[in-house]
């Protein structure tokens, strides 16, 4: 591996080892990094970092693509069922890979339940292969999920209950789900960055969940004086998640807290935390709200190609259903 990296200008065996230790295992990781990220590694100057990045981009053939090439790339997108046919219809078939989907809502609106359900659905072959088109089957072999829990709400027993409701083995779902408990934003960001290490180690990560995205940032950066710092850090975190989705054709799901809008006279009286940073970085954005009994309403209000729409689903002992 070190021998491969030495093909880059200014990278000798010693620098190659430092890059590998820092998690830069291939040209693509270097090509999609910033100069600032590489200069954090001891012994790498800004000039050297710039040369490495440009050379890596040439080797990876990064640059402009025609619309036809992008259309072909879109054919590798696959979709995963949410468990609700009505919600899947709003999403034109299910949760989409190569994208970040946000579910925001008040407590009890069903955010964490959807996250648990997707871990189960990932292990159901008929769900995965429902809309594969150009995806190679080997790419989807033994798919695994990563669940970064920032609020202590992941419940393995609930996953088992949902799996049994779906007719599959709960232990299999848990065996294929990596869980990390993040107590602060630094841990949360580190776990997200370490996902590439899991992939390089031979784990076929196809689902990444952050539950919830903004709680640690919200707790640490209080007051308007720290808002800019919080947003910059949150922006870097979202960039990491988008990169994972694009490079590894995986689905990224994030839940988000909401804040009241006291000046709202009509429409939704809450807004998702994170402002424009999250709004621009998320591909699909949902608001969840409670309805009668076990019913919940999911409203899609932002998407690059789908219309605004709503779906009603239920949270039962067996999981997410219509």
Curated annotation (Swiss-Prot):
**Disulfide bonds listed in the record:** none
Fetch the InterPro entries from UniProt.
Answer: AAA+_ATPase (IPR003593), DNA_recomb/repair_Rad51_C (IPR013632), DNA_recomb/repair_RadA (IPR011938), DNA_recomb/repair_RecA-like (IPR016467), DNA_repair_Rad51/TF_NusA_a-hlx (IPR010995), Hlx-hairpin-Hlx_DNA-bd_motif (IPR003583), P-loop_NTPase (IPR027417), RecA_ATP-bd (IPR020588)
What the entry lists under SMART domains is as follows: AAA (SM00382), HhH1 (SM00278)
Residues bound to ATP are 105-112
> Does the record carry DNA-binding as a key word?
yes
Q: Which PROSITE patterns match?
A: RECA_2 (PS50162), RECA_3 (PS50163)
Q: Which Pfam families match?
A: HHH_5 (PF14520), Rad51 (PF08423)
Q: Which family does it belong to?
A: Belongs to the eukaryotic RecA-like protein family.
PANTHER family membership: MEIOTIC RECOMBINATION PROTEIN DMC1_LIM15 HOMOLOG, RECA/RAD51/RADA DNA STRAND-PAIRING FAMILY MEMBER
Q: What protein does this entry describe?
A: DNA repair and recombination protein RadA
Write down the species: Methanococcus maripaludis (strain C5 / ATCC BAA-1333)
Source lineage: Archaea, Methanobacteriati, Methanobacteriota, Methanomada group, Methanococci
